[in-house]
Structure formats: C-alpha cells, structure tokens
C-alpha cells in the first residue's frame, strides 16, 4: 500500500460525501490560487513557530520548578495538533480537494473564536498565553480572509448536490 492510497483513505473519512470532488486543473494551477496557498503556508509556518515557542515557555517554567497548570499544557498540545491538521487541509486543498478547502476555511473561522473566548476567561491562562492565543487567532483570521477571496470561492465552488430520488414504498 502506498502513501497516496493511505491519504485517500483519510480523505474519504475527513471529506465525507465530497471526498472525491476536485476542482478543475485550470483553477488549481492558476497563479492566483498558487499565491494564496503560498501565503497560507507561510502563515501556518508562523503559527507553528509561535506554537512551538509557546510550548518552550511552560517547559522552561517547569524545569525552573514553577507549577504549570494542566490547562496550559492541554491548550498548547491542542494548538499544535490543530496547526498540524490545518497543514494537512492546506496541502490537500492545494492539490484540488474541495473538502479540504471547505474544512480549512471553516476551521480558520471557528478556531479563532474559540481561542479568543477561552483567552478572555479571567485567570484561565497566564498573560503570555493570552497573547499567544490572540496572535494565533489573528493569523487564522488572515488565512480565512485569503480563502474567502472571490477567486478562491470561484475556484472551490461548492459541488452540486446529487438529485434526490423518491423512494417507492411497496404496499
């Protein structure tokens, strides 16, 4: 079994009914599409650097003997896992998969809201982590903006629904 067939299996699970739908080769290779994905990749790299840097802070605090709340460890692990997932979605979307584009666009709008709401809870996170969450959110909102341009919405137009067939009931 090769890697691509494993990835296609993952796509079928993650993509649902649109797992096999890809955009036209012309739109996929369009320079505008390419520029958007270059920008998104760099923004995700920045996310990864910030997330990794943020992970270094509690590690250093812990090594120094300070108590680090479990919620900080969990949030950092979740942020790094989400960023990894977003990289996968961006890669598959760049290869033309509609489902990956739609997931990337959706999550780049939802994750910032969740991050900002949790960062606003008094005393939940230390100040350095609240700052990291705000940066994380702003970068994701930038990704959402790139994905919402007219060109990208045209390139990744929602596939038409299959016509519903009436089920005949035997009486």
Where are the language model's segments positioned?
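Topology signature of small-to-medium multi-pass alpha-helical membrane proteins
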Residues: 1-171
């Amino acid at each position: 079994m090769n890697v691509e067939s494993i990835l296609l299996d993952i796509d079928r699970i993650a993509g649902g009914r649109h797992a096999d739908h890809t955009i036209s080769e012309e739109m996929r290779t369009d320079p505008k599409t390419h520029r958007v994905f270059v920008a998104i990749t760099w923004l995700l790299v920045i996310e990864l650097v910030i997330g990794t840097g943020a992970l270094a802070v509690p590690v250093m605090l812990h090594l120094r003997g300070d108590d680090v709340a479990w919620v900080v460890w969990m949030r950092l692990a979740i942020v790094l896992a989400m960023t990894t997932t977003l990289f996968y979605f961006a890669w598959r979307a760049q290869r033309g998969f509609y489902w990956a584009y739609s997931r990337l666009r959706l999550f780049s709008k939802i994750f910032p809201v969740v991050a900002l709401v949790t960062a606003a809870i008094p005393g939940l996170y230390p100040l350095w982590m609240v700052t990291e969450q705000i940066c994380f959110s702003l970068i994701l909102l930038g990704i959402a903006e790139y994905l919402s341009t007219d060109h990208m919405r045209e390139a990744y137009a929602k596939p038409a629904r299959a016509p519903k067939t009436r089920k005949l009931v035997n009486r």
